[in-house]
């Protein structure tokens, strides 16, 4: 998952 590798991606993923 994006969140797993990049925190920024996590913000967009949520």
UniProtKB/Swiss-Prot annotation:
PTM field: Contains 2 disulfide bonds that can be either 'C1-C3, C2-C4' or 'C1-C4, C2-C3', since these disulfide connectivities have been observed for conotoxins with cysteine framework V (for examples, see AC P0DQQ7 and AC P81755).
Taxonomic superkingdom: Eukaryota
Alphabetically ordered keywords of this record: Amidation, Disulfide bond, G-protein coupled receptor impairing toxin, Secreted, Toxin
Modified residues (Valine amide): 14
Other facts noted in the record for this chain: Negative results: 5-10 uM of the toxin does not have activity on 30 different class A receptors of GPCR, voltage-gated sodium channels (Nav1.2, 1.3, 1.4, 1.5, 1.6, 1.8 and the insect channel BgNaV1), voltage-gated potassium channels (Kv1.1, 1.2, 1.3, 1.4 1.5, 1.6, Kv2.1, hERG and the insect channel Shaker IR), muscular and neuronal nicotinic acetylcholine receptors (4 subtypes) and neurotransmitter transporters (3 subfamilies).
A GO MF term: toxin activity
Function, in words: Interacts selectively with the G-coupled somatostatin sst3 receptor (SSTR3). It displays antagonist property for SSTR3 (Ki=1.5 uM). Other somatostatin receptors are also affected, but with a lower selectivity: SSTR5 (Ki=80.2 uM), SSTR1 (Ki=169 uM), SSTR2 (KI=159 uM), SSTR4 (Ki>100 uM).
UniProt note: domains: The cysteine framework is V (CC-CC).
Annotated localization: Secreted
Originating organism: Conus consors (Singed cone)
Disulfide bond entries: none
Tissue: Expressed by the venom duct.
Name this polypeptide is given: Tau-conotoxin CnVA
Keyword Transcription regulation: no
Family classification: Belongs to the conotoxin T superfamily.
GO cellular component entries: extracellular region
